[in-house]
């Protein structure tokens, strides 16, 4: 595995690889890698001749009161995970390398961002789309891999790739969970012991809701109320949202039918956790 820190060297390598006909699987991350990231890397390894991993904590996607400064970082750990999962190139640029001057152009996402995390975090997805436009141009991937834990992000990325005719296939990968159901996340390290014990109730609330839908419930408000009340009963977290939308278009659902997403965000003392399930309802 080779570690690359400059845009110029990374672009030169990927240009040569694509010119020689090699397929490139790309996994963009903010680091502090866990089993969820490892799953993305293994899938990229299975489906491509070359695997590129980026580790970059992107300041553009953090709001003024968010956790940019304390976002967990451990490049030694990330290098080990990368090596163990078949990464060929680890792209690890500095902020100054990615943004050497004030950004004069950003990608403004106008659809699929006014709900869920996009509603709570204005400007977040513009930051995500902008850095991905840069990373796609730097790494020239054949396929790019994203976890469905942030399903809204996947929907936004699929839309922006289609809109700009970017020649990359977006590959969504199922959520990876702890044994007790908690979705794996770099931010789980912020949980206190008590919060960690309560956190699996987020996924349990989604499973209970799924059972109700499969049993025939089609009223969206009944389902979202059930989820909120369950979380408020069994955790000390504050429900930021518990919402149902069509997926991937993220339109409001009254009657549950077709492909939908039930997504939640819950705030604990030092961390905000998200989770979701997608299902197709006939």
UniProtKB/Swiss-Prot annotation:
Keywords tagged on the record: ATP-binding, Cytoplasm, Ligase, Nucleotide-binding, Pantothenate biosynthesis
Record-listed E.C. numbers: 6.3.2.1
Record's catalysed reaction(s): (R)-pantoate + beta-alanine + ATP = (R)-pantothenate + AMP + diphosphate + H(+)
Keyword Signal: no
Residues reported in the UniProt entry to bind ATP: 30-37, 147-150, 176, 184-187
Record InterPro entries: Cyt_trans-like, Pantoate_ligase, Pantoate_ligase_C, Rossmann-like_a/b/a_fold
GO cellular component terms, semicolon-separated: cytosol
Pfam annotation, one family: Pantoate_ligase
Residues engaged in binding (R)-pantoate: 61, 153
GO biological process: pantothenate biosynthetic process
Pathway: Cofactor biosynthesis; (R)-pantothenate biosynthesis; (R)-pantothenate from (R)-pantoate and beta-alanine: step 1/1
Annotated binding of beta-alanine, by residue: 61
Locations listed in the record: Cytoplasm
Major place of residence: cytoplasm
Catalytic residue list: 37
GO terms of molecular function: ATP binding; pantoate-beta-alanine ligase activity
Family, similarity comment: Belongs to the pantothenate synthetase family.
HAMAP family: PanC
Function: Catalyzes the condensation of pantoate with beta-alanine in an ATP-dependent reaction via a pantoyl-adenylate intermediate.
Protein name according to UniProt: Pantothenate synthetase
Organism: Bacillus cereus (strain ATCC 10987 / NRS 248)
